[in-house]
Regions:
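N-terminal helical cap/lid subdomain that shapes the substrate entry/recognition surface
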Residues: 6-101, 109, 113
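A short, compositionally biased domain-edge/stem linker segment
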Residues: 1-4
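Short alpha-helical
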Residues: 27, 57, 105, 126-127, ...
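Well-ordered alpha-helical segments embedded in enzymatic catalytic cores
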Residues: 102-106, 159-162
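Conserved Lys-Pro-Asp/Glu-containing loop-to-beta segment of HAD-superfamily phosphomonoesterases
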Residues: 12, 154-164
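Substrate-recognition/cap helix-loop segment adjacent to the acidic, metal-dependent catalytic center
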Residues: 39, 64-68, 104, 108-118, ...
């Protein structure tokens, strides 16, 4: 790897996951479209996707799709159901079901230099577990170092700030 040594000081490297280390946008859009139709009878628009879905915790997205009418129990149900559909779509998409080129080599480099790194993602825990198992991410990052949507974060920015 041709990585130039640097004198930049930092505490940790934080990676986003979906759409950065793993190109899965089409699977998310397909799953959210399916649930938008189920919840409100219509699919999602590109504007809704950009403003209310991408990078937003599931609870907020489902609250948006339901017009704020769902109970916490309904929100949790649809969140789990949507993500199960998403995981199925990922496994069916065998051509794209892998980390981006160079990710594993870069993780190896960071680990060899003892540079701490982690992943912060708006994904829920079952998806994080799915990614860890599917891509063997625990070769580089301990399971308890992943930051994910556990219902306590307002947005992805808060997750990134908490990551290191």
């Amino acid at each position: 790897m041709n990585t130039k040594e640097s004198s930049i000081n930092f505490d940790c490297v934080v990676f986003d996951f979906n759409g950065t280390l793993f190109f899965d946008d089409d699977n998310h859009v397909a799953a959210w479209n399916q649930f938008s139709k189920e919840i409100r009878g219509i699919g999602i628009t590109p504007q809704e996707l950009h403003e209310n879905i991408n990078g937003v915790p599931n609870q907020q997205t489902i609250t948006f799709l339901s017009g704020g009418t769902y109970t916490q129990e309904q929100i949790d149900f649809y969140s789990q159901k949507k993500e199960a559909v998403y995981r199925e779509k990922c496994m069916e998409d065998t051509e794209n079901f892998h980390l981006v080129d160079g990710a594993e080599e870069y993780f190896d480099y960071l680990k060899s230099k003892n540079i701490p790194f982690t992943i912060a993602t708006a994904s829920i825990k079952p998806n994080v577990d799915f990614f860890i198992e599917s891509f063997h991410l625990d070769r580089w990052i301990p399971r308890d170092h992943f930051v994910y949507d556990d219902g306590t974060y307002e947005n992805k920015v808060a997750m990134f700030q908490d990551a290191c």
